[in-house]
Regions:
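N-terminal beta-strand motif that seeds the catalytic metal site of vicinal oxygen chelate
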Residues: 1-21, 69-71, 122-127
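Core segments of cupin and vicinal oxygen chelate
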Residues: 10-52
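Short acidic/glycine-enriched loop/turn segments that link adjacent beta-strands
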Residues: 39-43, 65-67, 98-102
Length: 127
């Protein structure tokens, strides 16, 4: 089984779009990339990290325990890993669909959120 990191998702306060772009884009030099149309309402700002990883900065109010902070793992077979998690007593759950990127979320034993996905083609082009 092949597993690697696809993105890191971190919170940012409402109204911080300029500061987010200034720090990650201007200061750190990360190129901004468009988020899929299906999640634009979430006011996320995405940056490219290296060749195939991403940083997702999402608006969260208030910043606190009920967070959507998570990391994403690319897996060969989304259905297989979902079945394994279900069989082990975990509760995978679905979120907004991104075309070309089947995915689901699940909490680890400590409550951390993990996104599991497969990348099918160039999902940023499949809008």
């Amino acid at each position: 089984m092949s597993v690697h990191l696809q993105h890191v998702s971190i919170p940012r306060p409402p109204g911080s779009e300029d500061k987010t772009r200034a720090f990650y884009g201007d200061l750190l030099g990360l190129p901004e990339i468009p988020a899929p149309n299906s999640i634009q309402a979430a006011e996320v700002i995405w940056f490219r990290l290296g060749e195939d990883a991403e940083l997702h900065c999402f608006r969260e109010k208030p910043l606190g325990d009920a967070s959507n902070r998570h990391f994403c793992l690319v897996v060969d077979d989304v259905a297989d890993i979902r079945q394994k998690l279900n069989a082990a007593g975990y509760a995978p759950y679905d979120v907004e669909v991104i075309p070309g990127r089947p995915r689901f979320f699940c909490r680890d034993p400590f409550g951390n959120i993990i996104e599991f996905t497969s990348i099918v083609g160039d999902y940023l082009e499949l809008q």
